[in-house]
C-alpha cells in the first residue's frame, strides 16, 4: 500500500493547477467585454399556513389564494413576483466603468409585497475566481481562493467529456461547516484548467439572518482561446422572514443567460 502525502493527492494537484491558471481564466484580466443578457427573477411565497390571509401585505388579497400551488416538499407556495429583462451589458477595466442598456423588461406580481425588495439583492455578480465572495453582507471564502485548501477538502470524483472538452469533476466540502464557505462540485477543463461549471450551496452553519439556504449554479463558455465567460447562472434563495412564528417565507430564483460576447473592444468614454 502506497500512502501519498496530502500534496500528492490527485485532487490537490488539480486544485493547485486551477489556482495557478486563475490569472488567465478570470474575466477580470480583460480590458473590456460586452454581451447580451437575459435575466428572470421569480419570488414565490412558501410555508403558507392558516394565518397567511391575516398578514398585513396580503390581508385584503384573498383572491390570491386561488393561485396556490404545491412545491416538491408538499408545502403550499404562491407565485408573488415575476420580473424579466433583456439588456446589453458593457464593462471596461481601466478605469473601471460599466453600462447596461435595458432593451426590454416587465414585472408582474403583488405590489408592495415585502418580497419585492429581494429582487435587487439577487442581482449579484458572483465571480468564483475571487478569493472572497460577498453575499448579503457576508464574506464567503471561495473554493477557488488561493488559500482554499486550508478551508476545504477536495475530492477528485470523476472525469468525462462535456461536449468536446475533457473535464474533471472536483467535489469540495468545508473543513468546518460553521465557517462562511460552500459545499458542492465543479467540472474543470483538463487543458486550460478553467471552470466549465460549478454547483454550490452555502455551508450549513453559515448565518445569513433571514436566508435559510442559498444555491448557485454557473456554466461557462470558452469564447476565445484563453477567455472563458459566464454563460448561464441559476441562483436560488430560501428566505424566512417570520422566523419566530414560521408562518411563511419566500423562495427566490434568478435565471440568467448571456450570449453574443465581444471581447476587448473598448468604447469611447462617453459611450
Language model regions located:
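Short, hydrophobic/aromatic-rich segments at coil-to-beta transitions
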Residues: 32, 163-171, 196-199, 227-232
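Structured extracytoplasmic
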Residues: 4-167, 173-181, 249-271
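Hydrophobic lipid-interacting interfaces of membrane-associated proteins
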Residues: 40-43, 175, 203, 236-241
Amino acid at each position: 500500500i502506497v500512502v501519498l502525502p496530502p500534496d500528492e493527492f490527485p485532487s490537490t494537484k488539480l486544485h493547485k493547477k486551477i489556482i495557478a491558471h486563475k490569472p488567465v481564466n478570470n474575466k477580470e484580466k480583460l480590458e473590456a467585454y460586452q454581451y447580451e443578457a437575459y435575466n428572470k427573477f421569480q419570488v414565490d411565497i412558501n410555508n403558507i399556513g392558516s394565518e397567511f390571509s391575516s398578514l398585513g401585505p396580503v390581508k385584503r388579497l384573498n383572491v390570491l389564494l386561488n393561485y396556490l400551488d404545491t412545491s416538491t416538499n408538499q408545502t403550499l407556495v404562491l407565485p408573488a413576483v415575476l420580473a424579466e429583462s433583456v439588456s446589453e451589458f458593457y464593462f471596461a477595466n481601466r478605469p473601471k466603468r460599466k453600462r447596461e442598456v435595458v432593451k426590454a423588461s416587465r414585472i408582474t406580481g403583488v405590489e408592495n409585497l415585502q418580497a419585492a425588495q429581494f429582487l435587487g439583492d439577487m442581482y449579484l455578480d458572483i465571480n468564483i475566481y475571487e478569493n472572497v465572495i460577498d453575499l448579503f453582507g457576508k464574506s464567503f471564502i471561495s473554493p477557488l481562493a488561493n488559500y482554499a485548501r486550508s478551508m476545504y477538502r477536495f475530492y477528485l470524483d470523476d472525469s468525462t467529456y462535456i461536449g468536446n472538452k475533457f473535464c474533471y469533476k472536483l467535489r469540495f466540502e468545508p473543513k468546518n461547516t460553521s465557517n462562511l464557505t460552500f459545499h458542492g462540485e465543479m467540472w474543470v477543463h483538463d487543458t486550460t484548467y478553467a471552470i466549465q461549471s460549478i454547483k454550490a450551496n452555502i455551508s450549513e452553519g453559515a448565518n445569513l439572518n433571514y436566508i435559510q439556504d442559498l444555491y448557485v449554479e454557473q456554466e461557462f463558455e470558452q469564447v476565445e482561446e484563453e477567455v472563458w465567460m459566464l454563460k448561464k447562472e441559476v441562483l436560488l434563495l430560501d428566505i424566512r422572514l417570520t422566523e419566530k412564528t414560521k408562518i411563511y417565507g419566500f423562495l427566490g430564483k434568478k435565471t440568467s443567460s448571456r450570449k453574443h460576447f465581444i471581447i476587448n473592444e473598448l468604447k469611447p468614454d462617453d459611450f
